[in-house]
């Protein structure tokens, strides 16, 4: 009904390739075997046909049960993948990349894992959670540029493994965990103190206007690397670090980050263009405490304008997603869209609030919501507009 496909992960920590094979057999094999017949007994005559499988999750993380070294994981993932393909050769598999770019083994982990699994996987995973522990808004809005770096580094590593094999195969990227998340990470706020309550509130991050801007920057980073990032999963969707909040027996409302996500989904369809951006820049230092020590990442020459351009060849339309990272000044934008002949503005919206700590709530669900963007000038291939300070904006032209 929702028009989606599942992505399932097998357990390669406390379990192994045999358990992975059995799970796939249960899901995808037509019948006549122990596990497929068990599925049929459970009421599902036809196979589920799950095509996308993750070979474990964050296996480099010491918080995982039976975390692995890169060699340990790589060997186990290779054997699991081999056995799974014997059951269903049509599946697509993702190997675990580093749990974060700040992990001590980052880089070497990807290299070693892919040297083991290259012939058996289509993807390697990436995870990122943006934060503003330092209370530095400018750095927070610049940190999606580190996502760009992360993606480009992993692509380079994957392609180096291919080059060593003299292979034309290209490993794609599965950015299967990403979001803004930091307030509820440290407080372990909802740990069960006594008993086993049903559905207690857990990790209910309340998102601000500021968060929506950083989130929008992450959306742009993903779109601008659509040639290699072939799947990207927001973690999570409802209540737990989520764009949608609910109350038991009560209201449901959209958090601030809902809007960039919804607009990326609606307008980010077509062909991602390689836009050349000429913008004033600023320098920042991003703080990320992930790992055993504090990590400070310099971000040099972050452009105030972060932009993604999407062409819809069917309608000959052009969609622009733009982030103005200047905290106090509007940004005049001129786009030269070579070959574009559109004459009308289909949609023009901006997400902006003078209070960057503004939030949505059950009492005020539309406190932060898209508003109409100001006048847009269309003159042939030249498009002119002005972005409010600290804003996320979407323009659709046809």
Q: Could you describe each region identified by the protein language model?
A:
Residues 1-5, 83-90, 120, 154-170, ...:
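A structural motif corresponding to the C-terminal end of an alpha-helix
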Residues 168, 173-305:
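Aromatic/acidic polysaccharide-binding cleft in carbohydrate-active enzymes
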Residues 280, 285-302, 315, 323-398:
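C-terminal beta-sandwich/jelly-roll accessory domains of carbohydrate-active enzymes
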């Amino acid at each position: 009904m929702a028009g989606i496909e599942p992505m399932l992960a097998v357990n390669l920590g406390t379990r192994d390739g045999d358990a992975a094979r059995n799970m796939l057999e249960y899901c995808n094999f037509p019948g006549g075997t122990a596990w497929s017949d068990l599925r049929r007994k459970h009421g599902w005559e036809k196979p589920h046909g799950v095509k996308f499988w993750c070979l474990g999750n964050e296996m480099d993380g010491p918080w995982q049960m039976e975390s692995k070294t890169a060699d340990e994981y790589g060997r186990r993932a290779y054997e699991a993948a081999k056995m799974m393909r014997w059951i269903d050769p049509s599946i697509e598999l993702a190997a675990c990349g580093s749990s974060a770019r700040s992990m001590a083994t980052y880089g070497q982990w990807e290299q070693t894992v892919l040297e083991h699994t290259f012939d058996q996987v289509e993807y390697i995973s990436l995870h990122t959670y943006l934060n503003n522990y330092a209370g530095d808004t400018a750095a927070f809005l610049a940190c999606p540029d580190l996502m760009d770096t992360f993606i480009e580094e992993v692509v380079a590593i994957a392609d180096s493994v291919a080059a060593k094999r003299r292979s034309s195969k290209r490993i794609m990227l599965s950015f299967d965990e990403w979001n803004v998340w930091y307030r509820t990470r440290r407080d372990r706020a909802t740990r069960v103190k006594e008993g086993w309550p049903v559905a207690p509130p857990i990790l209910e991050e309340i998102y601000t206007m500021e968060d929506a801007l950083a989130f929008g920057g992450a959306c742009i980073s993903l779109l601008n690397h659509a040639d290699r990032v072939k799947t990207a999963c927001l973690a999570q969707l409802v209540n737990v670090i989520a764009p949608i909040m609910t109350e038991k027996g009560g209201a449901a409302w959209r958090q601030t980050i809902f809007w960039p996500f919804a607009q990326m989904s609606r307008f980010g369809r077509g062909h991602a263009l390689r836009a050349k951006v000429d913008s004033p820049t600023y320098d920042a230092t991003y703080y990320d405490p992930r790992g055993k020590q504090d990590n400070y990442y310099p971000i040099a020459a972050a452009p105030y304008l972060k932009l993604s351009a999407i062409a819809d060849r069917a309608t000959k339309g052009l969609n622009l997603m733009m982030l103005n990272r200047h905290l106090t000044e509007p940004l005049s934008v001129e786009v030269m869209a070579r070959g574009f002949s559109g004459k009308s503005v289909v949609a023009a919206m901006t997400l902006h609030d003078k209070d960057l700590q503004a939030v949505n709530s059950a009492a005020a669900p539309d406190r932060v919501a898209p508003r109409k963007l100001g006048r847009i000038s269309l003159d042939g291939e030249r498009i002119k507009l002005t972005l409010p300070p600290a804003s996320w904006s979407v323009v659709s032209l046809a």
